[in-house]
């Protein structure tokens, strides 16, 4: 996620035998230690982004706005198709050319290096909505959305980071390269080039180019952050009513198909992250399917219809994939 880096991980995990079992939802009392540099940085980014939004309606060239829209989608795909579904969950495999594309897209998103993002996300699934979860939604919307990046990590997060197996990630030279050269590589791709390109090719002003880059950046940040916050607090739970993650329609467009969060936490290894596959606006699944078609993505993992139906009947909240109620006695829960 965005800058709150503490090198807690090693490539090989330590034993969990001496650690207390955490049960969600959990939010034990704690003292928050604000990281003021992060607070000021996030504040500047958002103020600059709001000014960029103003410039879109007053002086920015249309080409600059179109470029920002395109780069925003690429940045989100760098998280959803790259750090999330490919590397964190290994829900499919990718050839080197596709991994290079995804690491460039991921750098556009600048939510720390992909390695840090993957570690935090694996912790999020292993200790979801407990004090071992870096963005514990049990602490409320603001904390899970961005507050966790503005304070020092919970002691449980620091302890349990050492239990996360990252050996597959550290054996990937593409991911190691991005982490090793994070400041120049990510800085160039996320901020410098998107500012220079409009100035060079169509004569945009520095102020317009920079502030619209900030707008694009904070929009992509908050789009992904909604999965941590809104999709853990609001929505319906067709697959498991006993967990916080929910199917949340408000995050549908912004997150390119990451809104089926109840499904994802039940079947995290499904590359579609949704029972609906690439139907509708699950653009991440469409992206992966395209590269599977040309042979750059392969070994795509999916949950079987039988497993999905069985889980819905056993632990679901009585809604179907669209959020409508169905009869638990019915043999057909999916339409």
From Swiss-Prot:
Needed co-factor(s): Fe cation
Gene Ontology MF, one: iron ion binding
Tissues with expression: Detected in pheromone gland.
Sorted UniProt keywords: Fatty acid biosynthesis, Fatty acid metabolism, Iron, Lipid biosynthesis, Lipid metabolism, Membrane, Metal-binding, Oxidoreductase, Transmembrane, Transmembrane helix
Keyword Transmembrane helix set for record: yes
Entry's EC annotation: 1.14.19.5
EC primary class: oxidoreductase
Motif (Histidine box-2): 121-125
Location relative to the cell: Membrane
Name of the protein in its database record: Acyl-CoA Delta(11) desaturase
Species, as recorded: Choristoneura rosaceana
